[in-house]
């Protein structure tokens, strides 16, 4: 084995295949860009982002871990969200949940 060498499985790897997913249209009504990371509780994002926050409760962006989506001022785009797994507890972020979903 060589340090850093990868041994990927054959076939396609599907991320979040078993989790509930939705698509939402999101608009940045602010005057500055807003960037949202892969595991941020989407319902608690910057208030300049306009979308159905109740629909986004308990969900995060359906993108690879460690990546982010950037919303430029005035930009509208559709994003896919995926539900949190595990104990479905949310702490921190903007402090709106602080416990079970």
Curated annotation (Swiss-Prot):
Gene3D superfamilies: Urease, beta subunit (2.10.150.10)
Localization, UniProt: Cytoplasm
Protein name: Urease subunit beta
GO biological process: urea catabolic process
Top enzyme category: hydrolase
Recorded name of the encoding gene: ureB
GO CC, one annotated term: urease complex
Annotated transmembrane regions: none
Reactions this protein catalyses: urea + 2 H2O + H(+) = hydrogencarbonate + 2 NH4(+)
InterPro entries to which the protein is assigned, alphabetical: Urease_beta-like, Urease_betasu_sf, Urease_subunit
GO molecular function, one term: urease activity
Oligomer and partners: Heterotrimer of UreA (gamma), UreB (beta) and UreC (alpha) subunits. Three heterotrimers associate to form the active enzyme.
Entry similarity comment: Belongs to the urease beta subunit family.
Record's keyword terms, sorted: Cytoplasm, Hydrolase
Pathway: Nitrogen metabolism; urea degradation; CO(2) and NH(3) from urea (urease route): step 1/1
Keyword Protein transport included in the entry's annotation: no
EC number annotated for this UniProt entry: 3.5.1.5
Disulfide bond positions: none
């Amino acid at each position: 084995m060589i340090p850093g060498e990868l041994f990927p499985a054959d076939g396609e790897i599907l991320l979040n295949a078993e989790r509930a997913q939705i698509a939402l249209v999101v608009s940045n009504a602010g005057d500055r860009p807003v960037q949202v990371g892969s595991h941020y509780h989407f319902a608690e994002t910057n208030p300049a982002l306009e979308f159905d926050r109740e629909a986004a409760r308990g969900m995060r962006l359906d993108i690879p871990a460690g990546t982010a989506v950037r919303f430029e001022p005035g930009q509208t785009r559709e994003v896919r969200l995926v539900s949190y797994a595990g104990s479905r507890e949310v702490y921190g972020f903007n402090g709106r949940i602080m416990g079970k979903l």
